[in-house]
């Protein structure tokens, strides 16, 4: 491996070394605060070396990885989200009696898997990254093993994820049988030169891969696990599952879609269009029926993945820009929303029912305000980053003339307003006497509160003045296209 390859791979090398080092620290000396601080230092170092890797990008590390601005941008997003989740989770994990330190080891390992996905340029590295991410998530979901819902969430995710991995492997086998190649670049060359004798096996393999990835992204009809798993998982793990896990898989999917020239495969486009419509409508309609905050946000997440699929199908520069910008917005909004749930919850008492948030403004006004901003942004209200993200997707859809998808996109956004406003109204209702008596007078975790405040600031700042972020994202899109 050359020095340039080594420099380009620094973020991946550092996160790997950090995971191993933290494992040894936990094995030798158990101290929750020390483990958390070591995790923060590791993630900050991973972020600090990204500019060094960017200086030598684009760098192909054959045959598995490509380190370009696109991969590094998503790595930065992954590490930043993991950093925020670490800060949000500290107060929550202090309430866990049984060995809270391993949580941070698993968080770093899951982040490693996600970062590998962002840099993958080969089906082998795709599968490696996906399995590291998935196995870490199995353990994280069932981490409070004394609680039945958490164990149930872990087992459900394990069984269904195993099935999706099998479909993924079968799809890879079909593509290899047809093309003799597993690298994304090799596939791109074969397709551009028309070297395929028949596209039947190739399209069947691609469809199976999309099915396997669709489970991870909880597209309809692969979404049935999402609400139960979100509800049963510890609050900080739910935040990770909703953001880092899905963001990394979608980053990989977008690279694969561009490399295989997805818009030229009519059958694939029709299939994904049906999935997008079903995902948007099902996510929003099912969210209307829920009284559990985690389940509402789970179905909201499903709907937002449908919105992102519209931008994916739009393709082109504007489509890639829309996807990337929306992921930044999505990370901020969902980290903030699940962050509020995290700082109010503990391992023994999750604040997840709508009734738990009724009248929150009257005893936690700051937290109610932050939650309100996050929900308004998820709904796409102007002056928030969510509005800019939705406008970007709409513009990409108009440029690609995806009228049916745009109509569904608008209808889904209107439906979403109802369940977001339902939560907001509950936040500001006058609490009952019993509710006031149950309100906890204890102070909120300082690090979690500061993290939420910073997320809210970014949400408003990039909603009002998104130009600097847009310029970065345009450079990222050019690196992929």
Swiss-Prot record:
Catalytic activity reported: a quinone + NADH + 5 H(+)(in) = a quinol + NAD(+) + 4 H(+)(out)
Parts of the chain that traverse the membrane: 6-26, 36-56, 71-91, 100-120, 123-143, 157-177, 200-220, 234-254, 268-288, 296-316, 323-343, 368-388, 401-421, 444-464
Name the UniProt record assigns to this protein: NADH-quinone oxidoreductase subunit N 1
InterPro entries, sorted: NADH-Q_OxRdtase_suN/2 (IPR010096), ND/Mrp_TM (IPR001750)
Pfam name, any one: Proton_antipo_M
The species this protein was found in: Nitrosococcus oceani (strain ATCC 19707 / BCRC 17464 / JCM 30415 / NCIMB 11848 / C-107)
PANTHER family: NADH DEHYDROGENASE
GO biological process: ATP synthesis coupled electron transport
């Amino acid at each position: 491996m050359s020095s340039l390859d080594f420099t380009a791979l620094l973020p991946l090398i550092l996160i790997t070394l950090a995971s191993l080092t933290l494992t040894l620290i936990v094995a030798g000396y158990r101290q929750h605060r020390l483990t958390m601080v070591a995790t923060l230092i590791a993630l900050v170092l991973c972020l600090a070396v990204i500019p060094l890797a960017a200086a030598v990008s684009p760098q192909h590390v054959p045959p598995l990885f490509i380190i370009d601005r696109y991969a590094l941008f998503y790595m930065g997003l992954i590490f930043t989200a993991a950093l925020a989740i670490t800060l949000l989770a500290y107060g929550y994990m202090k309430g866990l009696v049984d060995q809270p330190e391993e949580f941070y080891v698993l968080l770093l390992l899951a982040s490693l898997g996600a970062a590998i996905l962002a840099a993958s340029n080969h089906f082998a590295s795709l599968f490696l990254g996906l399995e590291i991410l998935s196995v870490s998530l199995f353990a994280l979901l069932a981490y409070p093993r004394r609680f039945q819902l958490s164990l149930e969430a872990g087992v459900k995710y394990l069984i269904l994820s195993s099935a999706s991995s099998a479909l993924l492997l079968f799809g890879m086998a079909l593509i290899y049988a047809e093309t003799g190649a597993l690298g994304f670049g090799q596939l791109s060359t074969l397709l551009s030169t028309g070297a395929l004798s028949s596209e039947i096996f190739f399209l069947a393999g691609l469809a199976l891969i999309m099915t396997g990835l669709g489970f991870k992204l909880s597209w309809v009809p692969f979404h049935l696990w999402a609400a139960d798993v979100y509800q049963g998982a510890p609050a900080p793990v739910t935040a990770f599952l909703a953001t880092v896990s899905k963001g990394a898989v979608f980053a990989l999917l977008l690279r694969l879609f561009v490399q295989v020239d997805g818009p030229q495969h009519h059958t694939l486009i029709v299939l994904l269009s049906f999935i997008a419509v079903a995902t948007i409508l099902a996510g929003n309609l099912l969210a209307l029926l829920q009284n559990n905050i985690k389940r509402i946000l789970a179905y909201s997440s499903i709907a937002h993945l449908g919105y992102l699929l519209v931008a994916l199908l739009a393709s082109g520069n504007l489509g890639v820009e829309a996807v990337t910008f929306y992921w930044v917005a999505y990370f901020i909004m969902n980290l903030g929303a699940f962050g509020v749930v995290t700082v109010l919850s503990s391992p023994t008492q999750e604040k997840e029912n709508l009734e738990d948030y009724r009248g929150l403004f009257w005893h936690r006004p700051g937290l109610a305000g932050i939650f309100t901003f996050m929900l308004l942004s998820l709904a796409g209200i102007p002056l928030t980053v969510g509005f800019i993200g939705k406008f970007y997707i709409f513009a990409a859809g108009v440029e690609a003339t995806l009228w049916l998808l745009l109509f569904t996109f608008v209808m889904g956004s209107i439906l979403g307003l109802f369940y977001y406003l339902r939560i907001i109204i509950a936040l500001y209702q006058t609490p009952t006497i019993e509710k006031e008596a149950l309100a906890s007078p204890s102070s909120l975790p300082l690090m979690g509160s500061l993290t939420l405040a910073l997320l809210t600031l970014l949400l408003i700042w990039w909603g009002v003045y998104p130009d600097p972020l847009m310029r970065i994202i345009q450079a990222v899109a050019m690196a992929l296209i």
